[in-house]
Amino acid sequence: MKISKDKLLNKTTSHEPEFIEALELLVDDINANKEINNFGIIAFMHQLNNRMNVREKIYKFAENKNMPDPAAPIIVTGLPRSGTTFLFDILCNDADHRSPLYWEITRPLPWLEKGSWRESLRIFATDAELRFARLVVPMLDAMHKLRALSPEECEQFNTVTAKSVVYIYMSHLPNYKKFLMETDFTNVFEWHKKFFQILELSGRPLSLIHI
């Protein structure tokens, strides 16, 4: 079982060269890894299909729109397992601050009024996916607790650009990892901006929190 780059590219009309380069390297490294079983390939396919769909929706929504710049960020940074996620979660309990929730990263559009019944459906669908993920990977909660309503880190959103450490957490991808260490992340921040501009349509916080 192999992942098709062409099928993924057909899901989105936004094809900046940096994105195509990253996606090609990612897919080639996944397909070359003989240690990934069919369940692993299915997990990658599900992740990539979702991210391409979200990428296209964001691109179409933001196209030709003059949206205000997002609020100034607070950036939480640190080494893995150093407590950054705890600090991130504490900051997100302050009503003046804002971080994307997990469901908003996986299902941000079409845009919804906050608190609508359609929002509840998206939250339910996201939690159902996460429950299944915990069945397949019982240690998932011990590694990184994920819930639909949990504030989530920027790397989860970066997946729409095909430049994210999330993919190297899923499998051993040495060539792709080397690429991430050396690549320019300008286009990643450009997509971040679009995403936060859309999130702020439901209310502008004092600051956005990044990790």
Where are these regions (language model features)?
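Extracellular/lumenal mucin-like low-complexity stalks
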Residues: 1-12
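Charged, amphipathic alpha-helical linker segments immediately N-terminal to NTP-binding catalytic cores
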Residues: 13-51
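N-terminal pre-Walker A segment at the start of P-loop NTPase domains
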Residues: 44-64
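Phosphate-binding P-loop
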Residues: 65-71
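Glycine-rich phosphate-binding P-loop
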Residues: 76-92
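Post-Walker A helix-loop "phosphate-sensing" segment adjacent to the P-loop in P-loop NTPases
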Residues: 94-103
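PAPS-dependent sulfation machinery
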Residues: 106-207
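Conserved small/polar residues in nucleotide/adenosyl-binding loops
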Residues: 209-211
